[in-house]
Amino acid sequence: MAREFSLENTRNIGIMAHIDAGKTTATERILYYTGRIHKIGETHEGASQMDWMEQEQERGITITSAATTAQWKGHRVNIIDTPGHVDFTVEVERSLRVLDGAVAVLDAQSGVEPQTETVWRQATTYGVPRIVFVNKMDKIGADFLYSVGTIHDRLQANAHPIQLPIGAEDEFNGIIDLVEECAYMYGNDLGTDIQRVEIPEEHKELAEEYRGKLIEAVAELDEEMMMKYLEGEEITVEELKAGIRKATTSVEFFPVICGSAFKNKGVQILLDAVIDYLPSPLDVPAIKGTLPDTDEEVERKSSDEEPFSALAFKIMTDPYVGKLTFFRVYSGVLNSGSYVKNSTKGKRERVGRILQMHANSREEISTVYAGDIAAAVGLKDTTTGDTLCDEKSLVILESMEFPEPVISVAIEPKSKADQDKMGTALSKLSEEDPTFRAHTDQETGQTIIAGMGELHLDIIVDRMRREFKVEANVGAPQVAYRETFRSAAKVEGKFARQSGGRGQFGHVWIEFEPNEEGKGFEFENKIVGGVVPREYIPAVGAGLEDALKNGVLAGYPVVDIKAALVDGSYHDVDSSEMAFKIAASMALKAAVSKCNPVILEPMMKVEVVIPEEYMGDIMGDVTSRRGRVEGMEARGNAQVVRAMVPLSEMFGYATSLRSNTQGRGTFSMVFDHYEEVPKSVSEEIIKKNKGE
């Protein structure tokens, strides 16, 4: 089967936003206008095509990024719908990694919100070009230019409107196209009666002002256009389009457009903008990777002629076909039934069937080409972030990094039958989601699950019940505290046991010191002259790593410290790896009195939106939760409070906010960093963990 769409005519885009900005509705409308859906599903009726897991339809939020393919004006557009809820940032992170461009959806009333900032930061990390779609122009309080202002203020992004709305709220009935200097008027809310007309007289002055600003902004990034502009020459529509495209694909400029997906206004123009301004796989830099044996850097160009290489970015369990591996092809061609190498794991895999997905329906295809996104059936060992490549031309593409979980709960099956199924369910779910972990607590024997927030774990438990028929009781949430050292010291660990026959002997001197935040544990061997034989050195490192997992103060993992083995002694007969492991853990215990250990807690960036009259109560409440208020501003007729609050103080906040504001307040939070716990709180945590 020959390639249906050329690489130039392929777009791989993501749709990203804060929860409730109308992202899934926008995707739905795109699928509707590109002919993939016959009846539109409304999110608030629980009928959306992209949200196909039961919980997504119930909660009206998107949890897993469904990958869908659509066609528009001779182009193939592969769309990944990403979740806007903060607990699912891993989904956003994975999809951004494999996209060439993205549409950031904003709510016209709120502009940039906290999760928008998080997602925007992730997109910047991966160098993803973006268009901004200011949605919900029909909503009360919609303000396009305010929203554009928030992009400058909060994201420090070089964003400029390439459209202006005609009217707002109930009066929103048209869009001015600043590039083509025309307007589109909507005769109804069905998107069927659209007329291209001249810009209405009363809007001409504003349109001219903003077109001038647009040309100036684009010319600043394009020398040729700048010369023409300065010499007062006319800049043609084609030149302006080419300038916007070049500046957008190089991530120096972000075009802003507007509309109301729900009212079917602006969606076709959004699709045109995706084609006009977002890059094809040929416009983005060739993907870099390394050779498995030598770590030498190589690149793979977007071409069917190059050897096959792809990145697995999502694993899903499908009730009918089993495990689905979603992957993005960067180079070469793959046929179903062929063998590939998983170079990350060094395993050979057979690709059974290849499916192209449309939300929750699928079409079987025999071949995928460079630039395509598809799902494979039959890959046994592949997990998120693995590279798949041609067996004769190995490469490891740069993988993704996922944050550590910040919250955990104990979970126990309700019956013996549930217990057997729970193990399978948890291993499948953690295979799908790298930020979800499950382990058994050695001391209590309880199963502990950990994730990125309360909603994340709620949904995991929910999926266990629905998909795997496992009924379980869930304990109270626990915060993932960490421990670290604040000062350096040299300490001794000596383990000697003599009880007839062969004894045990290990003796070490270790220098501990704080490490930079986020650097983790680093072990260094500074032994000279063989006072500790070389074969026992790894045992010292391993002994420390094991001991660090169980903490020194309250049983939480110790992070961000350096340990150097500087001296020690051994016994010809009695020394063993085990003895040195134990000596190392004894040294860590001895460090407690000298290295000033402290407990660290996860801090959350919180944004609360409330009516003005509740401002005092909310500020007091945030402070009582050990929060630091970092900023306030008016947004329409509401007030926004931004604060940094410890996660441990945020449990049950939704209920408290509801009662404090008669249900009129909303909040969102995202993990930010770890910070030292105050002494009084630290003592409480230690007491609680010792069962006092």
Curated annotation (Swiss-Prot):
Tell me the domain of life. Answer: Bacteria
Q: Do the record's keywords include Mitochondrion? A: no
Q: Which locations, inside or outside the cell, does it occupy?
A: Cytoplasm
Under PROSITE patterns, the record lists: G_TR_1, G_TR_2
GO biological process entries: ribosome disassembly
SUPFAM superfamilies cross-referenced by the UniProt entry? EF-G C-terminal domain-like, P-loop containing nucleoside triphosphate hydrolases, Ribosomal protein S5 domain 2-like, Translation proteins
**Its Gene Ontology molecular function terms?**
GTP binding; GTPase activity; translation elongation factor activity
Its GO CC terms? Answer: cytoplasm
The entry's GTP-binding residues are 17-24, 81-85, 135-138
- Family assignment from sequence similarity: Belongs to the TRAFAC class translation factor GTPase superfamily. Classic translation factor GTPase family. EF-G/EF-2 subfamily.
Read off the PANTHER family from this record. Answer: RIBOSOME-RELEASING FACTOR 2, MITOCHONDRIAL, TRANSLATION ELONGATION FACTOR G-RELATED
- What does this protein's UniProt record list under function? Catalyzes the GTP-dependent ribosomal translocation step during translation elongation. During this step, the ribosome changes from the pre-translocational (PRE) to the post-translocational (POST) state as the newly formed A-site-bound peptidyl-tRNA and P-site-bound deacylated tRNA move to the P and E sites, respectively. Catalyzes the coordinated movement of the two tRNA molecules, the mRNA and conformational changes in the ribosome.
Q: What is this protein called?
A: Elongation factor G
Origin organism is: Bacillus cereus (strain AH187)
Lineage, please? Answer: Bacteria, Bacillati, Bacillota, Bacilli, Bacillales
